[in-house]
Amino acid sequence: MSAEPSGDPFVREMLAAALPCTLTSLDADGCPYSVVVWCALHGDRFTVNAGDGHWLANLRRDPRVSLAIVDTENILRHVAVQGTVVAIEPDPDYEHIDSLSQAYEGRRYQYSLPEDEPRFRVTIEPDRIRTLDFAPPGEAIR
């Protein structure tokens, strides 16, 4: 599949469902490091939000990432993204994390305050996207 997710209805459907995303970065020794994050689509780029921790340090050092978005009702429906971090920007007013929290939890982000924990909007340019939608029409596979 091309790396233009906004043109793919399945990718848009999966993101609109507010499914957990697994982001994998690379540690300094090359080992994969995975975390579960909230993600969104902005144009043809994916965005996630991060505190100033281990995996954000990984992204600053090596911008290669993968994202896996899996339907929690049917694991045979998923999106796999290989991409490159193209921007890491401060989210000083929590505008970005609040929008993700609204999508995933139906409320503003409540786990920290801007003055206590800086947050960062991470933008990922997809290089390759693969999808699997293995469900008979009108049926869920469990």
Sequence positions of predicted segments:
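Short alpha-helical
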Residues: 54
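Short beta-strand segments
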Residues: 18-51, 67-69, 78-80
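Short, basic/aromatic recognition patches
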Residues: 2-22
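ATP/adenylate-binding site constellation spanning eukaryotic-like Ser/Thr protein kinases
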Residues: 20, 64, 126
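Charged, gly/pro-rich active-site loop segments
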Residues: 1-5, 76-142
